[in-house]
């Protein structure tokens, strides 16, 4: 949240003078102990979780946030047991080797500084010079079986027709260029023979390159790269990308891919990158490098994909702009339909997922960590983000966990356009805004937890509409907010909302159809429970406050379908809460005892306020409520707009 100088400092001084001053599991969900083999609980959590509040004082956060504050991401090559349905009709069927037949076979065996071939097929010529192997083919239905080891060779394929490339325990190192270079625009069915280990390594320079041929990666193809098989492939790229296609790339269940790239992107596709399944691990260390990148679509349907990037940002003189690393970079669309995606970026300006157009999550598990700071070059800068789209973002299902701790600009989930959340379990814990949209934000379902340790929990730079789901937004102290939509329309028509921060945006009375209570107070401590009960004392829910609000007060916004207009509700602090269902400190169906009363509110209006610790009142923008401040205008203590 950006503020004009002078306004909030003055308000903070007035309010300070007048005041007396995570996540475990829901009933059917277990967010943090999913057994994916990718959470090692590193020792950095102490540094990451001791971020300073806006006032400069240290803040601590309670254990109710579970693994959100300390989960780690690391390379995991453990195989997965996955089922697969092979399509037999439509355009997709052509990409599956099971729907093709390659009966003519050519064997190529590398041995040290030499290579040999066997199997004669009309239309296929194999030329060998030492361990440099060049295949030229006009034949159809050919399978090339490749095995053996060389530390000074390569395989190049020219083919007029689609073919099978069977990697059957091969290790190729080419000090002068690509290890495998496919100069064919036809489909290449790349089979990792079951149980085999295959390794490709390039050199630090590509002196084998010619002016009329591309050589863009350690494993490069002009055509489609369609992977299958239950073997492994390790690619070590020292000059350019690891795996690259000038068409599209497809990975399937059973594939076990590892790419380490030190000078470029790990895996790059021009048209699209499809992950149907398998285990994909990539590491990049070059400046502004990408783990998985496509000029078009990136679509993940299954498997487990892990991306680690460590490079810093860089200035691009051609674009006259700066960019950082990204675990996933889609120049058009990113879609997640299933499987697991883990991204960790530690360099300046690094991002987890970056999408230039539409970003959609339908299902699956996404975990993102960024720890780098903002990258600057002169007056240009790029900030770390967990998930970022320049176009619209739709979060419809699955589980998303994002932690960004690198300082200013480290936002969790950001859309430069509209954001729509309709399902799933979404948790963001970030230094800057946890969830942010430049245009309208709509939340109609799902479980959402958003915590900005030095800024807002949820920040819409346009309208904000909540009609369903559980939405918890935690901002830091003055002038930051739990819910922030500047002075735009804020509609509450359903769902459970809990917002806490130094201040809050006010729901708009004319479009709000579910009662909202706003309370201002002087002090509340990390780990204390705020409880809400009806006038008979029956608990509606409890909320475990995730940080201290002790210096400049706090503002609490609450709304629930169980809180209806005309009825009274008891707000208490410091109760003992046991049992029940817990989502990031929001607890239902629990046993609640003790605590001291904060306020009893009768929800006589759509917006009811209480300044229970003597905060100032407002000027009539919203109706006053029980216990309202002087003037009865409905501005709760702690400061808000």
Placement of each model-derived feature along the sequence:
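C-terminal motif of bacterial Sec signal peptides marking the signal peptidase cleavage site
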Residues: 18-22
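A composition-driven surface/loop motif
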Residues: 6-7, 24-641
């Amino acid at each position: 949240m950006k503020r004009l100088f002078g306004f909030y400092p003055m308000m903070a001084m007035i309010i300070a003078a007048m005041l007396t001053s995570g996540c475990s599991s829901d009933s059917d969900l277990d967010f943090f102990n999913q057994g994916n083999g990718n959470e090692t609980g590193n020792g950095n959590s102490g540094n990451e979780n001791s971020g300073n509040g806006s006032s400069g004082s240290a803040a601590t956060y309670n254990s109710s946030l579970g693994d959100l504050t300390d989960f780690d991401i690391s390379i995991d090559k453990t195989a997965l047991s996955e089922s697969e349905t092979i399509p037999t009709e439509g355009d997709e069927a052509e990409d599956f080797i099971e729907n093709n037949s390659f009966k003519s076979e050519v064997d190529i065996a590398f041995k040290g500084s030499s290579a040999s071939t066997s199997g004669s097929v009309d239309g296929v010529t194999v030329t060998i010079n030492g361990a440099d192997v060049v295949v030229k083919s006009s034949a159809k239905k050919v399978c090339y079986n490749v095995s053996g080891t060389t530390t000074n060779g390569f395989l190049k394929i020219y083919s007029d027709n689609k073919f099978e490339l069977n990697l059957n325990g091969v290790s190729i190192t080419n000090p002068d260029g690509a290890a495998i270079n496919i100069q064919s625009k036809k489909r290449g069915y790349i089979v990792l023979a079951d149980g085999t280990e295959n390794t490709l390594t390039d050199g630090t320079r590509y002196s084998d390159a010619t002016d009329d041929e591309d050589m863009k990666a350690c494993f490069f193809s002009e055509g489609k790269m369609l992977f299958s098989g239950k073997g492994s492939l390790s690619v070590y790229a020292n000059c350019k990308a690891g795996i690259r296609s000038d068409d599209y790339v497809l990975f399937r269940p059973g594939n076990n891919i590892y790419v380490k790239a030190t000078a470029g992107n790990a895996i790059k596709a021009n048209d699209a990158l499809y992950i149907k399944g398998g285990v994909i691990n990539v590491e990049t260390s070059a400046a502004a490098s990408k783990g998985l990148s496509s000029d078009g679509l990136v679509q993940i349907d299954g498997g487990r994909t892990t991306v680690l990037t460590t490079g810093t940002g860089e200035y691009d003189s051609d674009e006259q702009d700066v960019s950082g690393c990204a675990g996933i970079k889609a120049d058009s669309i990113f879609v997640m339909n299933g499987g697991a995606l883990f991204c960790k970026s530690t360099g300046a300006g690094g991002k987890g997922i970056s999408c230039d157009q539409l970003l959609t999550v339908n299902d699956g598990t996404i975990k993102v960590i960024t720890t780098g700071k903002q990258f600057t070059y002169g007056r240009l800068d790029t900030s770390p983000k967990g998930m970022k789209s320049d176009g619209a973002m739709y979060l419809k299902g699955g589980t998303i966990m994002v932690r960004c701790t690198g300082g200013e600009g480290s936002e969790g989930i950001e859309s430069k356009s509209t954001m729509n959340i309709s399902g799933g379990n979404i948790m963001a814990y970030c230094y800057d805004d946890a969830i942010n949209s430049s245009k309208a934000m709509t939340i109609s379902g799902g479980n959402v937890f958003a915590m900005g340790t030095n800024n807002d929990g949820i920040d819409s730079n346009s309208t904000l509409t909540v009609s369903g789901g559980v939405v918890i937004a935690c901002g830091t102290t003055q002038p930051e907010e739990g819910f922030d939509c500047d002075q735009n329309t804020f509609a509450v028509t359903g769902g459970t909302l809990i917002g806490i921060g130094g201040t809050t945006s006010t729901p708009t009375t004319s479009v709000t159809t579910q009662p909202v209570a706003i309370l201002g107070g002087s002090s509340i401590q990390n780990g204390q429970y705020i409880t809400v009960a009806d006038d008979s004392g029956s608990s509606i829910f409890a909320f475990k406050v995730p940080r201290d609000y002790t210096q400049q007060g706090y503002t609490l916004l609450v709304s629930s379908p169980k809180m209806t207009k005309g009825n009274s509700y008891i707000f208490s602090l410091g109760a003992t809460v046991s049992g029940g269902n817990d989502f990031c400190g929001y607890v239902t169906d629990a046993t609640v005892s003790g605590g001291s009363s904060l306020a009893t509110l009768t929800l006589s209006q759509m917006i009811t306020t209480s300044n229970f610790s003597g905060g100032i009142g407002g000027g009539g923008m919203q109706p006053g409520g029980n216990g309202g401040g002087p003037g009865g205008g409905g501005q709760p203590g702690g400061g808000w707009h």
